[in-house]
């Protein structure tokens, strides 16, 4: 996977839900999709435990239904996330950090992650990357950026549970099972 060295901001309305000084009044939940307890997943799990994060792993024990690197197939992952967020759809004080897990380790605690999130001044922040995948013909549709990478990466984003849920339901049903 491409390292997420930069963040691309997706602004969904003005301002943020909570002030920076309200970090202690917010919960931070980490959500991921993984089907097997690989070495990479166990490493991710240990890093989350080290910082006392609640981790919700979706899809564990199921066969992978998210496609492969040859073509797009993220609909299954999105639908699992949508189901999980529906349980939290009214929780404006719960911040959800959705991330890949097989190639990720958490290196900071709640205060540092929420402080960094707050510095963007946006309700939802996505990771970004230098490649337009899986459909490079969409590259021209992405705006130019002054800092960081240009293309959204679904392997890392953060926002309140309610804002993420509303974003996902506004797009209709996701392709893929």
Predicted regions and their residues:
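Conserved donor-nucleotide/metal-binding helix-loop-beta segment in metal-dependent transferases, i.e.
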Residues: 105-144
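Short coil/turn segments at secondary-structure boundaries
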Residues: 42-46, 60-61, 109-112, 169-172
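N-terminal anchoring/stem segment of glycosyltransferases
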Residues: 2-3, 7-95, 119
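Conserved hydrophobic/aromatic beta-strand scaffold that supports enzyme active sites
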Residues: 80, 125, 156-158
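Histidine/cysteine- and/or acidic
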Residues: 89, 141-143, 175-177
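Short acidic donor-binding/metal-coordinating loop in glycosyltransferase active sites
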Residues: 101-102
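Catalytic core and acceptor-binding pocket of nucleotide-sugar-dependent glycosyltransferases
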Residues: 150-177
